[in-house]
Amino acid sequence: MPELPEVETVRRGLQPAMEGFRIDRAVAHRENLRFPLQKDFAARLTGQTVTGLGRRAKYLLADLSSGDVLLMHLGMSGSFRVIGADGETTPGEFHYPRSEDRTHDHVVFEMASGARVVFNDPRRFGFMKVFPRSEIETEPHLKGLGPEPLGNAFDASLLAKACAGKQTSLKAALLDQRVVAGLGNIYVCEALFRAHLSPKRKASTLANRKEEPTDHAVRLTEAIREVLGEAIKAGGSSLRDHRQTSGELGYFQHAFKVYDREGKPCPTCGGTVQRFVQNGRSTFWCPKCQK
DNA sequence: AATAGCCCCTGACCGC
DNA sequence: TGCGGTCAGGGGCTAT
């Protein structure tokens, strides 16, 4: 599924079922997702209480009473279902409907809350890993991640520094998780549109010679925070709508201004939204508005 | 070191 | 209906 807003929505949806509850039983229905699951994966989870459920970039991090951390990534198609006494929910449903195919239910947590938390992932680009909390700084998946775009540390000056001297495109730079963590293809397109910046522009143009932020960097920083904030809000509200009508699309897609809107009118200038391929991935933009 | 491209995998959709 | 090609929210690895 996910970029930052979807992962955050999933986190909030899982919290009531997991946080503060013991994992009575963990079951892995196959020995690998994207990577092989550790041999002791289920054993290290069973009997542990989830003391907190956090997020870093597009990763979910469940703190366990044992001192381990359960790291979870949804890849492209991963989703969770929470099956409780009062029915079934899917936190973080988004642009594409989640898989209904039970053959892709790969991992199940039976919580002491009575809820079953099921991880489903048809493409298996997602993965899970358990490691000691003490290794959080050296964990390869987390090491080198850039700042959280909604965190206090992230500002135009940080973004400018990270992009200074970069010869690659602004689009590619923003997708690089070392520059800023949590953006994906959708929100990069949307943020660039809101900032009126071309995806083809060199990343280095966010900084001047002293590596100080240009106006572009200021605009882009604001656009990133704004679009992520709005998307998280929409994720929250689409959750409620969604309990009734399973199988429909999410909510924030209606707020897309350029993503997935090739050939449709630009909401700002009335021109036409264009699509082209950049580093192997679709970029959607309005050439008239974005310079 | 920085950058671009390939690849992992399944399913949906489109044109023939 | 069936078949092949294309595309999809990510990111690790490898070759320049």
Swiss-Prot record:
Stretches annotated zinc finger (FPG-type):
257-291
Q: Does the keyword Acetylation apply?
A: no
Q: Which residues bind DNA?
A: H104, R123, K166
Q: Say which domain of life the source belongs to.
A: Bacteria
Name the keywords, alphabetized: DNA damage, DNA repair, DNA-binding, Glycosidase, Hydrolase, Lyase, Metal-binding, Multifunctional enzyme, Zinc, Zinc-finger
UniProt record, GO biological process: base-excision repair
This protein's assembly is summarised as: Monomer.
Name the family.
Belongs to the FPG family.
Name the UniProt record assigns to this protein: Formamidopyrimidine-DNA glycosylase
Name of the encoding gene:
mutM
